[in-house]
Amino acid sequence: MKKKLVCAYIIGYGIFPEWYSVLTPCKEATETNCYITWASFKRGYVPEQGSLLVGKTCVNPISWTIDTLPASTSGGMLLSVKAKKRFKSTAQIHNNYLWVKTNTPFVQTWNVLHLMDYNLYWMDIRKNVALRVAEYLKKK
């Protein structure tokens, strides 16, 4: 099964590596046969201990790495399908969850950004899916 998996995007939940005996977290943008996970919080916010959103693994949805270097994107969400402006975000892994800073107006007041785990990085996710699928097909 693992060899047939391009990538599992398990977004918004705390994942513990020991849950998957054959899958490991993705460590780079083109890696296949691995999983990606993150839970988003406002930069500087520390979630409650024991939160179901925080696990032992986090992949940065901009750099697609597991290091703690900050990364920036302008491929974030739109407020509507017709909107032309995309909102910018930065993401940095901190204690196995994602610290986020964004200029998205209504999100700036939230601490827990779980509802926005996909939206903040929708263009980054789309590009990454295409990249991983191409890499997977190249290996076949």
Description of each model-found segment:
Residues M1-E135, K139-K140:
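Surface cap/lid and interfacial helix-loop subdomains adjacent to catalytic sites
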